[in-house]
Amino acid sequence: MIDFDNRTSLNLHIEVIEQIASSLTNKEIELIVTDKDEMREINSAHRNIDKATDVLSFPYIEMPLSPLGSIVICSLHVEEKSKEFGHTLNDEFALLFIHGLLHLLGYDHEVDSGEMREEEARIIKEFNLPQSLIVRSEG
């Protein structure tokens, strides 16, 4: 289940997000979409990086019946990247969600041997989405 908090004026749909989440976990996920200023504040407070970023994940402590964690997505990145890559806002939203969800599930593309990239590619293909965040970042 997705607990969706859209703090922006973007018209985003979570049907595909719900399907992606339920294909990978049965735990609740908090999903927040916010503006670049709040994202910068969150990034600064939790990572000591004083700039906005596209997506952040915050896993919760593993306990029975506890939610998996929170994913925060920056609306500006959704808008800019969807225009840059020529796909819909909802496609970009889904790509960022997948990236954040995989981090909640323990994947880390900065240290793994390509497992996160492979899993991202599998999910993207399954849900017929455009090119992945990791592939774009490596290009």
Curated annotation (Swiss-Prot):
Binds 1 zinc ion. One of its GO terms (biological process) is rRNA processing. It is found in: Cytoplasm. The keyword Magnesium does not apply. Signal peptide: none annotated. Zn(2+) binds at residues 99, 103, 109. Keywords: Cytoplasm, Endonuclease, Hydrolase, Metal-binding, Nuclease, Ribosome biogenesis, rRNA processing, Zinc. GO terms for molecular function: metalloendopeptidase activity; RNA endonuclease activity; zinc ion binding. HAMAP family: Endoribonucl_YbeY. Single strand-specific metallo-endoribonuclease involved in late-stage 70S ribosome quality control and in maturation of the 3' terminus of the 16S rRNA. Belongs to the endoribonuclease YbeY family. This is Endoribonuclease YbeY.
